[in-house]
C-alpha cells in the first residue's frame, strides 16, 4: 500500500512561536537590539533542509561547519570544497544514519573529525543556568554556534529525537530560536528556554543516555593537508584493532633487534587493505570544468601538500621504511593509485558509489601554475554504465636525487606507511624488550623531532585515530571530549 503524502505540519503554538509571524519578528527585533542575534546571520546564510528524514544531525552539523568557514579539504561537486551531509560519514556509515538516524555522541565525533573545536554536554553534565550562559555566548558571536538535540514531544510536535542549530536568544523573554533543519515539516520557531532544556533533558532510547547540546567553533589548526583516515570501508574495524591491539603485542612478543625488524613485523602482518584506512587527500576536478592551468588557490594547496610530503621523506623513520620496502620488492604505481583516486573522486562528484565506476585509462602530464611553476596532473577516463567522464587528479610531488639526476617522487605506500606509524600513540612501542631499541623507536616517532607542518599533520591523524578507536569500542557516547594528543 502506498504511504499517504504529507505537506508540512502546523506548528503547535503555543508553546512555539513561528519565526515569520508578527510576534516572531518582534522577538527577533528585541534580541537583535540586545546583541544576541549575532550568530544568526552566519547560520541563516548557510541554512539548509535535511535531505533525508533521518539526516537532521548531519544537516545541522553541515550548516554550522559552513557557517564557521571550516574548509573540508576535499571537493563536494565540481571545483567546490563545501560541507554536505554526504561527506559526514567518518563516524557512522550514511546507510545506517539514513535508516536509524544518528546519536548525540556520533555527531560530536563527526564534528571533531571534520576539524572543528567542540565542547559537548549532556543535560546530566550541565545545568539550565550554564546552558543559558552558553546560549548567550553563542548567539552573541559569529565564531561559535550551538547545536541542540531534543525530544519534539515536549513542544507538542510530532516525532521524537531531533537535532537543530540554535539561531538566537531573547533574554527578556528567555526564548531561544530553533533553526529547524526539517523545513519540510516545521519552520524556524522561538521556544521558551526552560522548555528547550526540558526537551533536551530526556532519554534517547537508542543509547539510554540524556540528550544535550554542543558548542562548535573554528579550530586552532586546520584539518590534515595530505593524509586522512577513513572508515568508509568496512575493513577499518579490523585495521583499527590491528593497530591498537596487535602491533603492541607483536613488537613485545617477537624478538626484534633493529628498527628494520620492527618495521618488518608490523608491515608483514598489516591487513592487506590498510590503504583503504589511511589515504592521501586527493585534489579532484572534472576535466571539462577546468582549464589547462593551475589556479592560484590550487597551486597554493599543492605547494603545501608538497611541503608535507617533502618533510615526510626527510624523516629518519621514512628512510628506515624505504630501505625495508626496497628489500622486499615493494613497488608503487602512480597510475594505479591515481586510477583508484579518480574513481573515488568520481564517486564524490556524482554522489554514486565508487564500486559502480572503473577507470579505463590514465594519463600523466605536467601543467603550468600562475607563475610558470609546474604541477603533475593525472587525467583518468572513468566509466559508469557505459558513460565516460574525464577526471583530473592534482598530484603533489617532490624532487629526489638519484644516479641519473633529479627524479620526481609522488605519494606512495612508503610515505603513507610512515604517516601511519607516526600517528600511533608513543606507548605502542613501550613493550619492546631491548631498552635501547625502544628508546630509538620512540625518538623516531617523537613529535619534537618533526617540523611544524608535519607535526600538525600527525596530530590530525592521531586525533582521527583516537576518535575512530572510540567508535570501535562504542565509547563515543561516554567520552564527548576532544581527543588528547
Curated annotation (Swiss-Prot):
Q: How is its activity regulated?
A: Requires cadmium for activity. Also activated in vitro or in heterologous system by Ag(+), Hg(+), Zn(2+), Cu(2+), Fe(2+) or Fe(3+) ions, but not by Co(2+) or Ni(2+) ions.
| Outcome reported for the amino acid change (mutating residue 59 to V) | In cad1-4; loss of function
The listed outcome for residue 91 to Y is:
In cad1-1; loss of function
Please give the annotated consequence of changing residue 174 to A. Decreased activity
* InterPro entries the record matches: Papain-like_cys_pep_sf, PCS-like, PCS_N, PCS_N_sf, Phytochelatin_synthase_C
The UniProt induction remark is: Induced by copper, and by cadmium during the early stages of plant development. Gradual decrease of cadmium induction as plants continue to grow, and by 15 day after germination, total loss of induction.
Q: Which residues form the active site?
A: 56, 162, 180
User: One biological-process term from Gene Ontology?
Assistant: response to arsenic-containing substance
Q: Which ranges form a coiled coil? A: none
Which catalysed reactions does the entry list for this protein?
A: [Glu(-Cys)](n)-Gly + glutathione + H(+) = [Glu(-Cys)](n+1)-Gly + glycine
| The protein's Enzyme Commission number | 2.3.2.15
Query: Which PROSITE patterns does the protein's record reference?
Result: PCS
Outcome when changing residue 71 to A = Decreased activity
Q: Keywords in UniProt for this one? A: Acyltransferase, Cadmium, Copper, Metal-binding, Transferase, Zinc
> What is the uppermost EC class here?
transferase
Note the effect listed for residue 89 to A.
Slightly decreased activity
Q: Name one GO molecular function term.
A: cadmium ion binding
Q: Which Pfam families does the record associate with it?
A: Phytochelatin, Phytochelatin_C
Domain Peptidase C83: residue ranges:
1-221
Give the disruption phenotype, in one or two sentences: Plants are highly sensitive to Cd (20- to 40-fold) and AsO(4)(3-) ions, sensitive (eightfold) to Ag ions, slightly sensitive (twofold) to Cu and Hg ions, and insensitive to Zn, SeO(3)(2-) and Ni ions.
Q: Impact of mutating residue 204 to A?
A: Decreased activity
The Swiss-Prot or TrEMBL record describes its family as follows: Belongs to the phytochelatin synthase family.
The job of this chain, per UniProt, is described as: Involved in the synthesis of phytochelatins (PC) and homophytochelatins (hPC), the heavy-metal-binding peptides of plants. Also involved in glutathione-conjugates degradation.
Q: What is known of its domains?
A: The intermediate part (284-372) is important for enzyme stabilization.
Question: What protein name does the entry list?
Answer: Glutathione gamma-glutamylcysteinyltransferase 1
Which species does the entry assign this protein to? Answer: Arabidopsis thaliana (Mouse-ear cress)
Q: What is the lineage of its organism?
A: Eukaryota, Viridiplantae, Streptophyta, Embryophyta, Tracheophyta
